[in-house]
Amino acid sequence: AVNVNTNVSAMTAQRYLNQA
C-alpha cells in the first residue's frame, strides 16, 4: 500500500511539473 501511494504521489508531482 505504501509503495503504491508513493508511486501515485511521484506520478502526480511529475504531471504537475510537466503541466507547468
Swiss-Prot record:
Family per record: Belongs to the bacterial flagellin family.
UniProt entry keywords in alphabetical sequence: Bacterial flagellum, Secreted
Any one GO cellular component localisation term in the record: extracellular region
Cell location: Secreted; Bacterial flagellum
Protein name stated in the entry: Flagellin
Source organism: Vibrio alginolyticus
Keyword flag DNA repair: no
Function summary: Flagellin is the subunit protein which polymerizes to form the filaments of bacterial flagella.
Lineage, opening ranks: Bacteria, Pseudomonadati, Pseudomonadota, Gammaproteobacteria, Vibrionales
Superkingdom field: Bacteria
